[in-house]
Swiss-Prot record:
One of its GO terms (biological process) is galactose metabolic process. Signal peptide: none annotated. Coiled coil: none annotated. Keywords: Carbohydrate metabolism, Galactose metabolism, Isomerase, NAD. This is UDP-glucose 4-epimerase GEPI42. GO terms for molecular function: UDP-glucose 4-epimerase activity. It comes from Cyamopsis tetragonoloba (Guar). NAD(+) binds at residues 11-42.
Length: 354
């Protein structure tokens, strides 16, 4: 488990900290005694999430949180931020996430995910801040050679989103090889779901959700008429695809474990870790678990497979357990319970129905 030892007041920059995973991680950072600055362009998030974080942690810890509206693609925004504050490390969440959208608009994904990260590296290097946790993705494995996915598997992303994450990883590896003082951890998430147990913060995508759980939740609160399930003829027990769903609070704790590793390990280099549960759950199993948690029936519509979707993807978690001292503690039941608490408290997200 993640150490409960308080931090000694290190100052952390969290890019994309108003987003889904970022906001939950900021809560945990503040509770662990870190000082936090967020930079976010609010393209796919809202400032209300930051306000809710402040309410959750209370006025004392909230005084250690600062928000900056800025865009990593504008290197000047980063320059100003780093010239005003000395950061001990950076957690980099900022970016776009959506497989289908990336196929339709690849240049936007490479701009937001790759160019922005290169800008971040340049400014961090200029100000001699060389400890970095990067948000990567299980999509770098593509159709995996083996299940569960292990960190040293061959990487062959199958779409522009996955490739943008893979290229970020390659840039990180190259920079660390060139400048040995960098300490970089790449966290490959599987499928983040759930919400803070308070029901005050959660995932609030703009437009039609790209991912299963926010889609299910919007059907449950009658924002959408039915759930489209893409592919019901996979070679699995119920014909639907299998994924490794992980509670966002487990993910948040994984980032703190990674941060502590950066502060305590000199020769970490650039190392990748899977953050998942190690257990595969089918789409229909997830629907059934959400129906049980919410008491709502989810109407479904079976649709053809989407090109590039893998049959089954789940994580080997041994490396993170051994080297980070981190292990997911929440199961599917808790994921659905907390997702429903968020959805039922906020059926139209942070800003209500417009």
């Amino acid at each position: 488990m993640v150490s409960s030892r308080m931090a000694s007041g290190e100052t952390i920059l969290v890019t994309g900290g108003a987003g889904f995973i970022g906001s939950h991680t900021v809560v945990q950072l503040l509770k662990q005694g870190f000082h936090v600055s967020i930079i976010d362009n609010l393209y796919n998030s809202v400032i209300d999430a930051v306000h809710r974080v402040r309410l959750l942690v209370g006025p004392l810890l909230s005084s250690n949180l600062h928000f900056h509206h800025g865009d990593l693609r504008n290197i000047h925004d980063l320059d100003i931020l780093f010239s005003k504050t000395k950061f001990d490390a950076v957690i980099h969440f900022a970016g776009l996430k959506g497989v289908g959208e990336s196929v339709l608009n690849p240049s936007n994904y490479y701009d937001n995910n790759l160019v922005a990260t290169i800008n971040l590296f340049q400014v961090m290097s200029k100000f001699n801040c060389k400890k970095l946790v990067i948000s990567s993705s299980a999509t770098v494995y593509g159709q995996p050679d083996q299940i569960p996915c292990v960190e040293d598997s061959n990487l062959h992303a199958m779409n522009p989103y996955g490739r943008s994450k893979l290229f970020v990883e390659e840039v990180a590896r190259d920079i660390q090889r060139a400048e040995a003082e960098w300490r970089i951890i790449l966290l490959r998430y599987f499928n983040p779901v759930g919400a803070h147990e308070s029901g005050q913060i959660g995932e609030d995508p703009r437009g039609l959700p790209n991912n299963l759980m926010p889609y299910i939740q919007q059907v449950a609160v009658a924002r959408l008429p039915e759930l489209n399930i893409y592919g019901h003829d996979y070679p699995t027990k119920d014909g639907t695809a299998i994924r490794d769903y992980i509670h966002v609070m487990d993910l948040a704790d994984g980032h703190i474990a990674a941060l502590r590793k950066l502060f305590t390990t000199d020769n970490i280099g650039c190392t990748a870790y899977n953050l998942g549960t190690g257990r595969g759950t089918s789409v229909l199993e997830m629907v059934a678990a959400f129906e049980k948690a919410s008491g709502k029936k989810i109407p479904i519509k079976m649709c053809p497979r989407r090109p590039g979707d893998a049959t089954a993807v789940y994580a080997s978690t041994e490396k993170a357990e051994k080297e980070l001292g981190w292990k997911a503690k929440y199961g599917v039941e808790e994921m659905c319970r907390d997702q429903w608490k968020w959805a039922s408290n906020n059926p139209w997200g942070y800003q209500g129905k417009h």
